[in-house]
Structure formats: structure tokens, C-alpha cells
């Protein structure tokens, strides 16, 4: 089974999602260059690190499917929260749903 993924490819809405999360006060690091199924962003928010896979909600559902590598990674991840988001509001909601403290 190939789990290499598509390193370097980013969804059109990624920069808008990053901007929205930073305006919220989150620390955001893009990991989209890594590939191997690793989600696109590391998001730090009030003591929690969230892995965030970005899909472009403007595209048809068939074009938003997880790659084999992404699905494998998310199914086997044993760390903190890992979510899939399609737009800025979903990203903000995911961050607000996962907070530990007021750091």
C-alpha cells in the first residue's frame, strides 16, 4: 500500500484558513510540504495542538476525498485532535471545540 501522499500540493482555501486561525490567536504551521499523509496544518490553541487536514469545500465531494495516505494517517493517529475542514468557519469551530486552558 502506497502512503506517500502528495507533498507540496495545497488547497486553494489554505491561505484563507491560516489567516482566519491566526486572527483568532492560534499559532499555525503549514506542513503541506511533508506529505506521507500528514495533515496540512499544525494549529496551537490554548494548550492544545490540533492536526488539520484542509479540503476545498468549493470543490465537488468526489474531489475532496482523503488520499489513501491521509486516510491511513488519520485512522492510525494516536495523538491529540486531528480534524478535516472544508472552510474557514469549520476550522475556527474545530479550534474552539478543542481547548484545554486559557494560555
Explain the meaning of each model-derived region:
Residues 1-103:
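Catalytic phosphate/metal-binding cores of nucleic-acid and nucleotide-processing enzymes, i.e., regions
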Amino acid at each position: 500500500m502506497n502512503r506517500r501522499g502528495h507533498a507540496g500540493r495545497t488547497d486553494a482555501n489554505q491561505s484563507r484558513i491560516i489567516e482566519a486561525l491566526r486572527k483568532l490567536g492560534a499559532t499555525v504551521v503549514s506542513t503541506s510540504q511533508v506529505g506521507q499523509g500528514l495533515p496540512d496544518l499544525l494549529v496551537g490553541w490554548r494548550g492544545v495542538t490540533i492536526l488539520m487536514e484542509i479540503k476545498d469545500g468549493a470543490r465537488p465531494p468526489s474531489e475532496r476525498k482523503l488520499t489513501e495516505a491521509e486516510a491511513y494517517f488519520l485512522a492510525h493517529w494516536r495523538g491529540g485532535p486531528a480534524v478535516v475542514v472544508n472552510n474557514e468557519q469549520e476550522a475556527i469551530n474545530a479550534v474552539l471545540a478543542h481547548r484545554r486552558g486559557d494560555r
